């Protein structure tokens, strides 16, 4: 049985839902602009990684984590209760398409599904979480627009091709691309992932590149971004 993953200030139990901790999730959780946000929404929280990272990074925040899958929701709740921030983390077992809170959010974080139905080969909650049939980009963006405050920011991570498709769909929903970080595993590799920030408000656009591995191990940029979370980072 998978025992999960231990970070510097919290532990992620995987349980039976089969959703392992990924580098994608850690990158997004460390990168998202949530430091000044009072109300944060984690869409499709899985085991709760992004919510826990947000709570650690912003001690004044309240995080609502919405998860449809029963096993994942159960595990996320367990992870929240065992964390130092259990009073600021709220698990909502519900379909985000039917979620109607009383307030809007300053920040939204989401590690979206990105495989289409033709690529689906696995079964179970992990498979559902990774396929766009469960939450198509268009519907996800409509939800974000409805749930986000006028100056709020929504942050995502996607593979390069799907990320560019996502950005084009977002423009049709009147979103501005306000921040983009291109991820390369090494300097010689092509861009593999995109960290994407969207907002209805036209913030000044920022674009950067992050290379994960250098010749001697992890790059300094990657270490600086993730050092407050990974146990082996100084």
UniProtKB/Swiss-Prot annotation:
<keyword id="KW-0963">Cytoplasm</keyword>
<dbReference type="InterPro" id="IPR022882">
    <property type="entry name" value="tRNA_adenine-N6_MeTrfase"/>
</dbReference>
<protein>
    <recommendedName>
        <fullName>tRNA1(Val) (adenine(37)-N6)-methyltransferase</fullName>
        <ecNumber>2.1.1.223</ecNumber>
    </recommendedName>
</protein>
<dbReference type="Pfam" id="PF05175">
    <property type="entry name" value="MTS"/>
</dbReference>
<dbReference type="GO" id="GO:0032259">
    <property type="term" value="P:methylation"/>
</dbReference>
<dbReference type="GO" id="GO:0003676">
    <property type="term" value="F:nucleic acid binding"/>
</dbReference>
<dbReference type="GO" id="GO:0005737">
    <property type="term" value="C:cytoplasm"/>
</dbReference>
<dbReference type="InterPro" id="IPR002052">
    <property type="entry name" value="DNA_methylase_N6_adenine_CS"/>
</dbReference>
<keyword id="KW-0489">Methyltransferase</keyword>
<dbReference type="GO" id="GO:0016430">
    <property type="term" value="F:tRNA (adenine-N6)-methyltransferase activity"/>
</dbReference>
<comment type="similarity">
    <text>Belongs to the methyltransferase superfamily. tRNA (adenine-N(6)-)-methyltransferase family.</text>
</comment>
<comment type="function">
    <text>Specifically methylates the adenine in position 37 of tRNA(1)(Val) (anticodon cmo5UAC).</text>
</comment>
<keyword id="KW-0949">S-adenosyl-L-methionine</keyword>
<dbReference type="InterPro" id="IPR007848">
    <property type="entry name" value="Small_mtfrase_dom"/>
</dbReference>
<dbReference type="InterPro" id="IPR050210">
    <property type="entry name" value="tRNA_Adenine-N(6)_MTase"/>
</dbReference>
<dbReference type="InterPro" id="IPR029063">
    <property type="entry name" value="SAM-dependent_MTases_sf"/>
</dbReference>
<dbReference type="GO" id="GO:0008033">
    <property type="term" value="P:tRNA processing"/>
</dbReference>
<keyword id="KW-0808">Transferase</keyword>
<keyword id="KW-0819">tRNA processing</keyword>
